[in-house]
């Protein structure tokens, strides 16, 4: 809801101060350096021309959750001291996703921003929000004991955690504008998180997070006048 409201507000402000603005939407995937998974998702954005060859842009991306390939193990403890066994080992899989907010400047080479074929590139910044969730198995590692309701995880074994990071990067792409219709585009971004923090041990212990990641996007842009 926050992201949707932010886009609507930004769109209205841009319309109020400039006669031309572009909206875009598409799909793509994100891949962390040395990460075992690719995250597929969707994106939407706005682009505001400063002149025929230079624009400012903003984009929101949602890259859907993936699970770790290997299970991890946590220790759960009985809520009643008389329960036997008093502690159990339980396997779990962690899932991980990305929500991204990015903005930056694009410089077009070849034809103009709103005509023909051209390349573009520039620098950007990005805020990334990750949610880490643990899916615990219903029984312990032996398969003999159901633990939910009688046992509890430790204080540092929360079922959900979050990571917030700030990244700087570069983007390059190609686009072709069909007169009177719109623009198709493809771009690649390389981002490096210069600052990031997890709110608990669940967030900090995932192996799907990488400070260096690449985003590949394809989509359609419509110019509004």
Feature locations, PLM:
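Flexible, solvent-exposed coil segments and beta strand-coil junctions
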Residues: 20-27, 78-87, 146-155, 194-199
